[in-house]
Amino acid sequence: MSTWLLPENIADVLPSEARKIEELRRHLLDRFRSYGYEMVMPPLLEYIESLLTGGGHDLNLRTFKLVDQLSGRTLGLRADITPQVARIDAHLLNRQGVTRLCYAGNVAHTRPRGLHATREQIQIGAEIYGHAGLEADLEIQQLMLDALRLAGLAKVRLDLCHAGVLAALIEAEPAAAELGQSLYDALAGKDVPRLVELTANLTPVIRDALRALPTLYGDASVLDEARARLPNAPAIARALDDLAFLASQVEGAEVMIDLADLRGYAYHSGVMFSAYVDGVPNAVARGGRYDHVGQAYGRARAATGFSLDLREVARISPVEARSSAILAPWQHDEALRVSVAALRDAGEVVIQALPGHEHDLDEFAFDRVLVERNGNWVVEARA
């Protein structure tokens, strides 16, 4: 085996792609800050018990595990930063009011999420803690749409779901709870034949409701159909009311209702949402409410947030990274050194061509040159 080969679904990020990713990261973090979100940096490794707390079966399967050579305990290489940020809010910050936090960092997955997906993502996201009202859900959804707009993804479809619908159905039918992961997988995959098989022995009301979920997809009017086909339980009525409110308030995206879009259901407790764009089969961003996760760290807090993979969003973004630069000669000249330093301080990219390599600079678009005119170094358009 060649020594330079990388593991499957792991890849280097080359200069042009890295530049685009980094510029997008900076733009998004600046936008998060403009909303009042504070940056946190959780560790890449944690003890596995802490890392998987409240994360469910799926997170466990996606997490790389290794043995700590100092303590002998099992460590996990994070697959999702969201639970780590919940731990920081609940256990370290210990604030009583609303807290807004954001983050950006690498995560690793044991298996790829899709056919061509990478197992090492650059996850960026934002979370609100301390407010249980729909105002927080609306703010975080608008922030996600704002982030996608900054990436040049103007035509976005926002799919809304609610974990409370399935939770209420399972609570009403103990036999449904015993189906566990199989029921969730069938719903999330819209595998109707499998769903029919799994629900065959349930009471008719719950059976029919579960079988209806994959078909309850469409614009906000599908909520009327949901009210007619699902049990008239208070928890279900509240969930549908929440979705109706958010669907009427979201701006800048086509809003759809999908009551079977349950990815991440294991730790979500309320409204869930996903963003889709044309030409991309999977969601480009996901989020939702997870009020109970903080309880595992000693303090239950209302919480909602979203995250996306910077590498994937940068790949599909039509916005090109700024690669223009000023070409300057390499000379032992104090005035030249001062001019180059001043331009760089002003935010310009200035590249000095090393002797003998004046024609090797293909990575940048040199639209200007630094030339000497009458004893002064000035920037001119490149011919």
UniProtKB/Swiss-Prot annotation:
GO cellular component terms, semicolon-separated: cytoplasm
Top-level taxon of origin: Bacteria
InterPro entries per the UniProt record, alphabetical: aa-tRNA-synth_II/BPL/LPL, HisRS-like_core, HisRS/HisZ, HisZ
Subcellular location, principal: cytoplasm
Pathway: Amino-acid biosynthesis; L-histidine biosynthesis; L-histidine from 5-phospho-alpha-D-ribose 1-diphosphate: step 1/9
Gene Ontology molecular function terms on file: histidine-tRNA ligase activity
Record localization: Cytoplasm
Gene3D superfamilies in the cross-refs: Bira Bifunctional Protein, Domain 2
Keywords of this entry: Amino-acid biosynthesis, Cytoplasm, Histidine biosynthesis
Protein's GO biological process: histidyl-tRNA aminoacylation; L-histidine biosynthetic process
Signal peptide: none
Subunit structure of this chain's protein: Heteromultimer composed of HisG and HisZ subunits.
Family of this protein: Belongs to the class-II aminoacyl-tRNA synthetase family. HisZ subfamily.
Functional summary from the UniProt entry: Required for the first step of histidine biosynthesis. May allow the feedback regulation of ATP phosphoribosyltransferase activity by histidine.
Misc remark: This function is generally fulfilled by the C-terminal part of HisG, which is missing in some bacteria such as this one.
Protein name as annotated: ATP phosphoribosyltransferase regulatory subunit
Annotated source species: Paraburkholderia phytofirmans (strain DSM 17436 / LMG 22146 / PsJN)
Organism lineage: Bacteria, Pseudomonadati, Pseudomonadota, Betaproteobacteria, Burkholderiales
Gene name for this UniProt entry: hisZ
